[in-house]
Amino acid sequence: MHSKTAPRFLVFLLLTLLLLLAASPVASKGCVCKGKGQCLCAGTKGEKGEKGVPGSPGFPGQKGFPGPEGLPGPQGPKGSPGLPGLTGPKGIRGITGLPGFAGPPGLPGLPGHPGPRGLAGLPGCNGSKGEQGFPGFPGTPGYAGLPGPDGLKGQKGEPAQGEDRGFNGKGDPGPPGVPGFQGFPGLPGFPGPAGPPGPPGFFGLPGAMGPRGPKGHMGDSVIGQKGERGMKGLTGPPGPPGTVIFTLTQPYNKSDFKGEKGDEGERGEPGPPGPSGPPGDSYGSEKGAPGEPGPRGKPGKDGAPGFPGTEGAKGNRGFPGLRGEAGIKGRKGDIGPPGFPGPTEYYDAYLEKGERGMPGLPGPKGARGPQGPSGPPGVPGSPGLSRPGLRGPIGWPGLKGSKGERGPPGKDTVGPPGPLGCPGSPGPPGPPGPPGCPGDIVFKCSPGEHGMPGDTGPPGVPGLDGPKGEPGSPCTECHCFPGPPGVPGFPGLDGIKGIPGGRGVPGLKGNPGSPGSAGLPGFAGFPGDQGHPGLKGDKGDTPLPWGQVGNPGDPGLRGLPGRKGFDGTPGGPGAKGPPGPQGEPALSGRKGDQGPPGPPGFPGPPGPAGPAGPPGYGPQGEPGPKGAQGVPGVLGPPGEAGLKGEPSTSTPDLGPPGPPGPPGQAGPRGLPGLPGPVGKCDPGLPGPDGEPGIPEAGCPGPPGPKGNQGFPGTKGSPGCPGEMGKPGRPGEPGIPGAKGEPSVGRPGKPGKPGFPGERGNAGENGDIGLPGLPGLPGTPGRGGLDGPPGDPGQPGSPGAKGSPGRCIPGPRGTQGLPGLNGLKGQPGRRGDTGPKGDPGIPGMDRSGVPGDPGPPGTPGCPGEMGPPGQKGYPGAPGFPGPPGEKGEVGMMGYPGTTGPPGLPGKPGSQGQRGSLGIPGMKGEKGRPGAKGERGEKGKPGPSQTTLLKGDKGEPGLKGFVGNPGEKGNRGNPGLPGPKGLEGLPGLPGPPGPRGDTGSRGNPGRPGPHGMPGSMGIMGVPGPKGRKGTSGLPGLAGRPGLTGIHGPQGDKGEPGYSEGARPGPPGPKGDPGLPGDKGKKGERGVPGPPGQSGPAGPDGAPGSPGSPGHPGKPGPAGDLGLKGQKGFPGPPGSTGPPGPPGLPGLPGPMGMRGDQGRDGIPGPPGEKGETGLLGAYPGPKGSPGVPGAKGDRGVPGLSGLPGRKGVMGDVGPQGPPGTAGLPGPPGLPGAIIPGPKGDRGLPGLRGNPGEPGPPGPPGPIGKGIKGDKGFMGPPGPKGLPGTVGDMGPPGFPGAPGTPGLPGVRGDPGFPGFPGIKGEKGNPGFLGPIGHPGPVGPKGPPGPRGKPGTLKVISLPGSPGPPGVPGQPGMKGDPGPLGLPGIPGPCGPRGKPGKDGKPGTPGPAGTKGNKGLKGQQGPPGLDGLPGLKGNPGDRGTPATGTRMRGFIFTRHSQTTAIPSCPEGTQPLYSGFSLLFVQGNKRAHGQDLGTLGSCLQRFTTMPFLFCNINNVCNFASRNDYSYWLSTPALMPMDMAPISGRALEPYISRCTVCEGPAMAIAVHSQTTAIPPCPQDWVSLWKGFSFIMFTSAGSEGAGQALASPGSCLEEFRASPFIECHGRGTCNYYSNSYSFWLASLNPERMFRKPIPSTVKAGDLEKIISRCQVCMKKRH
């Protein structure tokens, strides 16, 4: 019934019941009798009665059946949101997702390297013979053949007729010769003069893209700064319609629905600050425990710009920049200056023209050979022709002549103009000229023609002689012809300047030459030696009248003391003195002993002067030492004024000049003169070529024009050190550039010299400038005459370290005469640094008492050249040496260096005040100052109107530990707790005392059925046991499980089986038991108890704690009442094992055990004996493996010729034919652009372009990130945060007091299966089982190796099968062939498939008894035997010397460290810390010998790839080495070459008798070595290091390498494959810190420690070695 009809049906029932009830009383009123007797009222229906009173409500009916399901009601209003649920526990890790879809195909890879060449293919079959081809085209005429060999030598000709005049007679002209071969191209001529400049060319097309650059530096894996906020994006498309959720608070009205949510509006302006909220609820007055540090907050807003920071340290290497665009092509260069004319060739007319020879190969220019020995004297030549001879060289200047007679008076005062002087040396650069007018814009022109060749360079130093060549083979038939000349070679490099040859033997005297032309006047000669005194001269002419006497001069300096005069004559007796006082009367004593000699008496008064003695003639005494500076004399009275002189009346006519006086002494150096005007130098007519002057005496010529670029010369030998350059002027401070990578720039081109400037006023003495750059090495000068000794110069930089000289002091020689001054030697090479001494014991702070002077030491080796000392006082003049021999006149020396300034003159009078000086140049930027003190706290900044939520502040420091609370009173006993959980097993108690040995036990009862044992772990094969006694024959075992497939044994002989037929298949095995539950991990060691904290607030009741350990026994209480019966006690500790009991009865047979693991495959069995013939045929064999393909047979004989076949398929493409004849010209092709060609190879590298125009100004660079700003004021209170994650579990509570043992509970549920028990002893042998069913047929075994067959001829391996061809038409049968040669035996085929079973054969006869079988496998292990008696005492072990325990010690200096006492060195080397290749680091343990490489290089490794290619130092890999305390250079430039040696630490590998370990204290105290260990060294605990790309490695703390003897914040240096090393700011070292033991298990306090206090926070350590006993 439908649900709609159910209510109608109920209404119908109710109406029916009401009608029935209403009808019953109406029926009794229908018939009324009114006294007329009995009426029969049957059948009359009365009227309808009145409506009755409604009856009382009936009882409720029975509960009806549930009606059908009603219609779904309307959706109710949404309920109010529920309270947020608690955060659920962390979910279980989800199942690993399905593998993702395959990604889009990657970009095509770069083409791989060409693979290695494949193996040669197998030789193909011989093809069939082809048909005869068409005749070929006639070939092109061949090249002319080589000339044939020379013909036989002709007969000797007749003698020529001619006159013997020294000329060869010239014959008649011969017949015209055969035209010669075409000559080979001659050497290229000299370049012609430059043509006129061409018109400007068009701009060239841009060049092809260059090859990919080398791999850049590895970037550091650092996170970049947060980028700037991007611009607001465009409004996105409208999203999908959202779900509207709202809460009805009033009757539902459809009109209350809102439309869809509009797009998100633009961000509004910040609103005004809201009113301050009500105070929050207080949840307890106590401050909570500090929370865990929160997650990292969002990055803060940019603060106000700070003050400019100081210049930062050098930054890390940046990422490699993007590749720049190609620069604009440079402008066309200027036309080069014209070159010098080429060498002049002279034509000698007297040479006879020879026959035309074959052109020879032009040989390369050989190196200049050494001077040969002088040849024998030649035959005297015939008299020379009277041609003018070459001008001889200018002779040496003659000696100074004696003084000539007085010459006649000169005629003119002014002489004729002298010859044109040499051009002066270039003056100092002049001031910069005014800016020029702007130049015209010129188009870029193509580069000009090459200029003329430049001057020929000086000849180079001769190269070293090559090794001696192999002796050539003797020439047997030398009919060789010179080959055609090759292409002319490049001109050879100029040879190195040769060593001057020895003096040659004087040649024979030549014929007298014709007189030469007048030579140039010679240079002024050097002053000659002082002549002997001349004869007395004639009386001189009357001098001119004397001048007036001048004013008296200033008193001179005090003179040197004079020589000691001769003794004067003794003076006369002195005058009589006055009478003395009266003496006391003397006692008459006896004569005394002679007294000692008295002291010398005082000098008497000086006597009167004696008469003058005769002049002394003693030898001249040595001048005394220079006296001390005298006291300046008293200023004398001013002298009287002299008379005014008469005016001079002399006329300008001078008298005749007097004789030249003797050369005066050199006057003091005058002031520098003013520069003269620039002289005009009209060029004179060119004179004849002069002869070469004295070598190196002429003035240097003007610089020649720039020559063409020569071929690169060989590397020259190092030049002599140049003079120290003058200090350069300080440059203008440049704008600070962006931080660049250190690079090596190319040297700039030298500028042109400026015009000479006027001499400026002398400035004040400036500070000493930085040393200038070293000058270019000068050409070494010839030795000049010794100048006067100069004052010591400025201290020079120390010379390069020389190699250590061998210093063996010889016997002392006699004093030699003073030698001549030798030439200055080259500075010696730097000696090796001596080894570093062992560190001494630290001395006390006080200085000790000075010791006695030691004995004089042996003279030491000469030390290194120190820096020149300060200027010393002038020394005393030395003894005059004997006159040297007269030397040869030296070459004209170069002008000497400027002498030192003279002694200061007396101070002049004060000059007038000078004019105002030019303002000085801007000083260089000072070094950044030291970091200032922290400033006072600033005022609060202006309030921000937008009160956005501030960033989360950094966690505050941990508060101090509070004082411990007072001890509380003892509490009342608590209520008994609920029944505790089952406790964890307690810790094992201490072992009890050993029990008495038990008596021998009774035999045990049979045990219960054991559980099936679990499978044991496969044991290690034990050692081979002794051979046991022969056991009784065992019962037949069960058939074993199928083993792993062993290797296929040799094929046995065909066996026999007696009537075994396959049984039915066995039942399916039992399902295996569930796997074991894993073992519970061991309990960790309890930590030490922490300090008691202050009492916290009452916590919520905790969850029931884990039962505690049993407490210690308390004090004895009062005797209690007798207790109830106690609970059973815990089991006692296990006693000692009793004697073994009697063997128990055998238990019932256990259940079937699990299947054991597969056994280790056994070795292949030996070949069995041939079985006897069986009675029944065996079962059907397994199908054999198909046999290998047989060898190819010998080809058969040829058959009869077949019929002509149908035309076959088109054959493969034939080889290319010969070139055809040229065809007729084709029609003009259509102009269709072809497809774009492949990309060409990258072009050759072009010449560098000229510099482009300056680019536009770059963007304004951002400054370096400033220091962290000061902490701002606290932000407004943040909104309440979301509920945090569930905190970590708290620390375990203190152990509770142990509860009373509970009443024994109900038996628990069955427990989990227990931990897997140990393997039980093997059970006794069970009864023999029934034979098992035959297992299923196994898979066929692997194919056996082919047997060895002796074949007659080994056929080649067959090639791979070709593609099957189309079947051809069937040909006619050929003729019968001859029988073929039998082929070699093929290899044995694989066994064929099993044949169908044959019919059973007849029963065989009974076989003989089989041979004795081989020894069976060893039986089960027996029970362990009884304990044996103790053995005899062994011999004591012998000690050894060194056991080969290796460790490495690093000095962290350039000294090689010594091995500690008791160890010996193996080798020394350089300290390698770690390497980094392909951005991955690999470290070395500094305690092992792998960290001590015997050779140092900045790139000690290379890398190889799968293409058999290895690359060395060709990409950006690194190596890191322990470094020394040497400071890095001031300019932070990378270090390379020999300059690296002072930066690399040395190391020694040592061998000791025992193991070496490192012990770390984690404090600043040095830890002691363990007992019976000795100390090797002490140091600092080094644990880890990182550098480029945050890659690095670490040290094992047990290794001696973790204990470095010296602490450095930067203990290692970074080196690169390009040969440079440096320290970089991203290198970090990690050390163990020193810890306060009271701070364990607490939050570490952050701190920063600066240099000077670093050793106070580093853990100390000691390396120890076990003692030898």
Swiss-Prot record:
Composition bias type Pro residues, residue spans: 105-114, 188-200, 416-437, 596-617, 654-665, 1128-1146, 1250-1259, 1333-1343
Region ranges (Disordered): 44-473, 500-1439
Role, per record: Type IV collagen is the major structural component of glomerular basement membranes (GBM), forming a 'chicken-wire' meshwork together with laminins, proteoglycans and entactin/nidogen.
Organism domain of life: Eukaryota
Motif stretch (Cell attachment site): 830-832, 994-996, 1152-1154, 1304-1306
Site note Cleavage, residues: P1424, G1425
Protein name: Collagen alpha-3(IV) chain
Broad class of the protein's primary localization: secreted
Limits of the Collagen IV NC1 domain: 1444-1668
Covalent cross-link S-Lysyl-methionine sulfilimine (Met-Lys) (interchain with K-1650) as placed by the record, residue numbers: M1532
S-Lysyl-methionine sulfilimine (Lys-Met) (interchain with M-1532), cross-linked positions: K1650
Leader peptide range in chain numbering: 1-28
GO BP annotations listed: cell adhesion; cell surface receptor signaling pathway; collagen-activated tyrosine kinase receptor signaling pathway; endothelial cell apoptotic process; glomerular basement membrane development; negative regulation of angiogenesis; negative regulation of vascular endothelial cell proliferation
Record field: compositional bias (Gly residues): 778-787
S-S pairs: C1459-C1550, C1492-C1547, C1504-C1510, C1569-C1664, C1603-C1661, C1615-C1621
Residues glycosylated per entry: N126, N253
Organism: Mus musculus (Mouse)
GO cellular component: basement membrane; collagen type IV trimer; collagen-containing extracellular matrix; endoplasmic reticulum; extracellular region
Keyword Signal attributed: yes
Keywords: Basement membrane, Cell adhesion, Collagen, Disulfide bond, Extracellular matrix, Glycoprotein, Phosphoprotein, Repeat, Secreted, Signal
Post-translational note: Prolines at the third position of the tripeptide repeating unit (G-X-Y) are hydroxylated in some or all of the chains.
Biased amino acid composition, Low complexity: 54-68, 202-211, 279-290, 382-393, 551-560, 666-684, 861-876, 970-985, 1092-1103, 1228-1248, 1366-1379, 1402-1429
Family named by the database record: Belongs to the type IV collagen family.
Compartments, record wording: Secreted, Extracellular space, Extracellular matrix, Basement membrane
Note on domains (UniProt): Alpha chains of type IV collagen have a non-collagenous domain (NC1) at their C-terminus, frequent interruptions of the G-X-Y repeats in the long central triple-helical domain (which may cause flexibility in the triple helix), and a short N-terminal triple-helical 7S domain.
Upper taxonomic lineage: Eukaryota, Metazoa, Chordata, Craniata, Vertebrata
TM stretches of this protein: none
Phenotypic consequence of gene deletion: Mice exhibit normal pregnancy and wound healing, but consistent with the human hereditary disorder Alport syndrome they develop a progressive glomerulonephritis with microhematuria and proteinuria.
